Structures are given as structure tokens and as C-alpha cells.
UniProtKB/Swiss-Prot annotation:
One of its GO terms (biological process) is nucleotide-excision repair. One of its GO terms (cellular component) is cytoplasm. It is found in: Cytoplasm. InterPro entries: Helicase/UvrB_N, Helicase_ATP-bd, Helicase_C-like, P-loop_NTPase, UVR_dom, UVR_dom_sf, UvrB, UvrB_inter. The UvrABC repair system catalyzes the recognition and processing of DNA lesions. A damage recognition complex composed of 2 UvrA and 2 UvrB subunits scans DNA for abnormalities. Upon binding of the UvrA(2)B(2) complex to a putative damaged site, the DNA wraps around one UvrB monomer. DNA wrap is dependent on ATP binding by UvrB and probably causes local melting of the DNA helix, facilitating insertion of UvrB beta-hairpin between the DNA strands. Then UvrB probes one DNA strand for the presence of a lesion. This is UvrABC system protein B.
Amino acid sequence: MTGLFQLVSSYSPSGDQPAAVQKLVTNFHAGIAKQVLLGVTGSGKTYTIANVVEQIQKPTLVMAPNKTLAAQLYGEFKAFFPHNAVEYFVSYYDYYQPEAYVPASDTFIEKDSSINEYIEQMRLAATKALLSRSDVLVVATVSAIYGLGAPEDYLSLRLILSLGEHIEQRQLIRHLTELQYTRNELDLVRGSFRVRGEVVDVFPAESEMEALRIELFDGEIESLSLFDPLTGQTVRKLQRFSVYPKTHYATTRERTLSAVDTIKDELKEYLELLYGRNKLVEAQRLAQRTQFDLEMMAEVGYCNGIENYSRHLTGKAPGEPPPTLFDYLPPDALLVIDESHVTIPQIGAMFKGDRSRKETLVEFGFRLPSALDNRPLRFEEWEVRSPRSIYVSATPGSYEFRESAGEVIELLVRPTGLIDPEIEIRPVATQVDDLISQINACIKLGDRVLVTTLTKRMAENLTEYLSEQGIRIRYLHSEIDTVERVEIIRDLRLGKFDVLVGINLLREGLDMPEVSLVAILDADKEGFLRSTSSLIQTIGRAARSVRGRAILYADKVTRSMRAAIDETERRRQKQKEYNAENGIVPKSVVRPISDILEGARDGVEVKSKGKGRRVDEVPADYGALNQAEIAAQMKMLEQQMYQHARDLEFEDAARIRDQIQRLREAGLG
């Protein structure tokens, strides 16, 4: 089923938003390929894009630079489009150690990974939505440029079921196993099916909560329905349903056997090359590893590391780019690149790092040369595959300006009337003493302070010194994982401490209305952390407070500082003029402090058959868990949920299911 994008919001566009939406939509319909949306912090860039999506009515891919921002955008778009398919496509690895070889120490490191099955389910849901409906918006990271199964294989393998269709049960089961579904008569879990008489139950790999029941009679589909796999309760009847493969890498038996033949040919050719170079150890190693993989593929259809043979499985020529999420997009889709000044350089860097590691594996006989084609897209390949695009940033880079050829739409006026922070320059010599007095002044007003330094050592020393002065302060460093980072930011907003010190973690996507002062130490030291873009982004962290200020501690004004100050002043001037013309009095953003890690903090009291009552052990504070541990916790709870279902304790099973759902949302952070 497909419909139209329907934006749900209690607000209507204001400030620069109506003009920006109109211009972006007009340019899109005119066929303009690249546009820039230059939007200041708090100007409603996400809401503006949501309005554009509603008006153009095209499938949309939104790319973010990291999982944290992707999760934030996913939540916002999900709220804007509750009746449409808003999907999430990020790396499904909680932990990933790629295979590698270190020649200097003759050390081979085996691939080791931990897959988050909930993220995998969301990835499958994203590709299914792209192939089956037009009202779909996918939020992704650079994971979107990595190799995926070919969409034509994914589509050709699907099992299309219709009411009244003739299909033998044995034929149905065979097709499900080709889709890599496993038969499980005890637990109907995601990616499995069970057979009871003439009823076949299937739990689609991309489904979050609903399973499919196929009722046959005399070789004919008599009934199709979705049901709750926990309670068995029917959710709704269906006329038609498509079961998609359990994995993006599923392929036909014929294609697999064909790939085995071409891999054998490549192996023979490369072994001759290695023997010719007198690399006997490498040749023996390669022959042994590859022959084992070939036997596994011929017998069971897959092997560990099968992605290294993806070129053979997809029938691509050597050097051809792999199929990616971009191949699932229709030609008329819209691509939105959020924080483009960070995301675009990331896209260019992915290929180079991947290539050097694999070249070493090939050279020393751990992989065939075709493994080099299991890779992310090169930057130029990504450019070719990108549909019409909008680059969104407060500080677009030179690439975005060049590609958009002057099509820059500005979003400088905030709906709240807030103006950009006032900037002051103060001397370096007295920066610490001055900073203490500024912090104390902010604390008296109940405000918070962000301080950014150049080095880790300076951040640590400053944190220690200010703490000795009685200031409640925390240090946000690169070793802190995503979940703990969110907890620290929440604690700052709650007032558990007043000052947050960081190096390069205080720029994009931090929404803290309580922060009224940003202090940038050693602002005159030119470099990546003190570039024009970095300075503007950091200054913008104080833009959600009516008392927002930025202090740059510097002995001279560098070119980057001058550009950042001039641009901020230009924006302030336009914002002041708009407020004066419309009689708007600036007021700070008021945003509730929601605990995104809430839920599942309390023990769930349930009954265990024959064992009296028990309380399932649930950690009191998920801030202490990383994403891998959260995934393990969800897996444990899921096992308990299915046990309750088998014991016919459906209320208890449903309660744990709700807990898993809250945990899953927390894990997206």
C-alpha cells in the first residue's frame, strides 16, 4: 500500500521558512540537481525539509554524519510523518573488527563482529519500503554507500502470495528456505517459519511486531492474515502479501553455483601468478582458504566472509561499483545531506581506508583480487548515483557551493526571534581567570557554559583546575560512547553540573537551550579546530538562549576568526531587522528534557511457571551500557518473552515486548 506524504505538525512555516520551502520546491521541479540550504542553528532546518518532502511527494534519502544525528533525525521525521514509511538505515554492527594482516609481525586478525538484529530488521524494512511504496523517507549514515545485495535479485527472490492462489505446501516451504528463512516449530522468531497442518506461519525478517499466517486448503491459499506472534491474535486480514529475503545478500541457487565456477577460474589464474612470483606460502594459504569457502557455498549456499565474493554473486565485472542503497532509490528521488560540511568529506574517505587494508590481504594470499570489489563507493561513483540533492548545513563547504552553482537558500531567521550570539574577543593571557568570572556570572542566572579547548591535556587540566575552584564541571572526550554522551548532555541540561569542557565534540547537533555562553580558548590558533566552519558551528551552540554569547580568547584576529565574526554579524543584522519589522521579542527555546534512555529502568514482575513469582533483573541505569550490551539485554528479554508466550502467559509476554521496544529506542541513541 502506498499513499501521499502527510506532514503532521502543530506549527506552520514562519520566518524564512515559507520562502525557503517555496524556492527549494520550485528548483526541484525545475530539474536543478544541487541546492544548498544554509540554515543557522535553531532555524528549523528539519521542519523545512519535511515541508519540502510533503510538497514534492518523492521518496527521500536523508544522510547524516553519525548514528547519533541519524537517530535524532529519524525521531523527528517519524513525528512529522506518522502515517508514512519513515525508515532507519545505519551500520548494523555493534562491534566490528575487519579481517586484516600485519606483515611486519606476520599477524593475521580474523574478522570479528557483533550484529544488532534490531538494526538489521530496520535496514530490511527500509529497502522493502523503497521497493514497494513511494511515500518513504529513509534516514541513513555513510553505511548507505557500502555494498548491499543487488535490488533486482532481492526483488526476483521475493515470494508474492495472493488470496485464492494455487501453491503446494512443499513448494511454499522450499521458496521460504531459498529466502534463507529457517524452520522453527518451537519459537516463531524473526526470520523463521513454522508449519502446523495446513497452516504456515512466517515472521518476516523486516517486520517489527507482526507475523504472517498462510492458511491452505487443497493447495489453495484460503486465508492470509497478519497476527501477533505472542498472543496469536489476528491483527488484520490481507488480500496479498510479499515475503522478502531474510538478508540483502540472498541469491538464487543457480547464481551461487555459477559464482562457484567463476571463483574457481579466478583462483586458478591468481595461483599461477603467485607461483610465478615464487610466493609458495601465499599460494598454499589462498588455495586452502578458498577451497573451504567453495565447498561451503556449494553445499549450504553461503560461507563466512561471503561478502568477499560479492562481485561473483552479483555478476559484476572487475572494478565495477557494488550495488548499494542508492540502487534501491528511484531516479526521481530526493537526497538530503545533513551537516554536509562533515558528511561529504566522510563519503570521500571511506573508499581509501578500506582499499589499503584489502590490498594487503590480497598480496599475502588471504583473499582473491575480487575481494577488492567488496567496497564502499568511490566519491565519483557516489556523485553519479546521487539523485537531485539538497545540502543542509550552517557552514556549507566549498564543494557544496561549487556544485550548487549559486543555488543557496538561506534560513537565517528563527521562529523564536532569537538572534545569533554576540561575539567578544578577550586576551589569552588572562583567559582562565576571566573564564572563571564569566562562568560564575552565568551560574547565578541559572545558565550553563560550554568551553572548547585545543588539546586533550588542556581540557583535562582545565577541568581539574575549575573543579578545585568549586565549579561543577565535566569533560566530554572522544572515548565516551554514544549512550554515555547523551547522558552527560542530559545531566548538563538538568543542572547536575554547570560547565561542559570538550575539544571537537561540541559542534554539530547539540541542542541545549540552557547554554548561554560558549568560550573558545586559544581561538587564534589556525587549524582544523579553529577554522571558519568550526568557529561558526561552535558559536552556534549558544544560539538557543536569549542571553547567548560567545567569547573568543585570542591575541590576534586570524582570517578564520574574521570570516566567522563577519558572517555571524551579517546574520545578526538580518535577524534584528526581521524582528523589528514584525514586532518579535526574542525568547529562549523551551524544550522539555526528555530522557531518551528512559523505559525499562524498573524490574518487570512476572510469573514463571512452577517457580512462583520472580522479578526479571533489569539494570537500573542504561547509561552505563554500551550499544552491544543493550543488544544483549534485548536478546535476553526476547528469550523470556517467547518463553512466556509458550507458557500461554500472554500479558507477561506483552509487557516484556513493550520493554524491548523502549530499549530498542534507547539503543538508537
